[in-house]
């Protein structure tokens, strides 16, 4: 559909612990011009976040990163 090409998407990321079942508050990963751009940024940001958290902490606390791309209403 033609209208979807102009829709923008906001990247929402979250770090969670499978050990505790808790998650940190959602983080705004910015607005992207397409679903593809948002999903690609989410994938890259997930890898970067894992690297920043570090292997030891990720393993110890069973951390994982999730993301979603929500449409920006009115954009």
Predicted regions and their residues:
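Short, mixed-charge low-complexity intrinsically disordered segments
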Residues: 44, 48-75
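Short, well-ordered alpha-helical segments
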Residues: 34-46
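Short, intrinsically disordered, charge-biased short linear motifs at domain edges
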Residues: 9, 23-27, 53-59
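Hydrophobic alpha-helical targeting segments used for export or membrane insertion
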Residues: 8-20
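A short, exposed loop/beta-hairpin motif centered on an aromatic-Gly-Thr core
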Residues: 23-37
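Short, Lys/Arg-enriched N-terminal segments with co-localized hydrophobic residues
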Residues: 1-6
């Amino acid at each position: 559909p033609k209208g979807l090409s102009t829709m923008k998407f906001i990247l929402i990321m979250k770090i969670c612990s499978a050990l505790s079942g808790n998650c940190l508050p959602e983080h705004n990963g910015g607005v992207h011009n397409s679903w593809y751009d948002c999903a690609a940024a989410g994938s890259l940001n997930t890898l970067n976040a894992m690297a920043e958290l570090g292997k030891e902490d990720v393993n110890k606390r069973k951390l994982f990163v999730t993301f979603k791309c929500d449409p920006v209403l009115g954009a």
